[in-house]
């Protein structure tokens, strides 16, 4: 099934992952894919990908001193965007197979 909003989602994805920011595009792409994430960020990024509703203030606070507000925000948004894309693709594939 074709996603009528694919071009908009792709533009959003490119801007968030490759646009200007405090974190590197490589770090944002890694968070979006949940691959090659720095070890200290891995638990948070994995949690966002698998069970985002369980992320706590403490999860973020542990990394705040190292990464700061802007970089943390960018990593969290990138991870959430990557997780949402995986779910969208799975849903569209399920509709295609139905």
List the model feature ranges, each with a label:
Residues 1-98:
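Hydrophobic alpha-helical segments
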């Amino acid at each position: 099934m074709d996603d009528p909003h694919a071009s908009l989602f792709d533009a959003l994805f490119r801007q968030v992952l490759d646009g200007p920011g405090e974190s590197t595009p490589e770090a944002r792409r890694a968070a979006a894919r949940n691959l090659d994430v720095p070890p200290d960020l891995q638990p948070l990024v994995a949690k966002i990908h698998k069970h985002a509703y369980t992320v706590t203030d403490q999860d973020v606070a542990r990394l705040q001193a190292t990464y700061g507000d802007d970089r943390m925000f960018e990593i969290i948004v990138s991870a959430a965007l990557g997780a949402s894309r995986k779910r969208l693709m799975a849903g569209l594939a399920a509709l295609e197979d139905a």
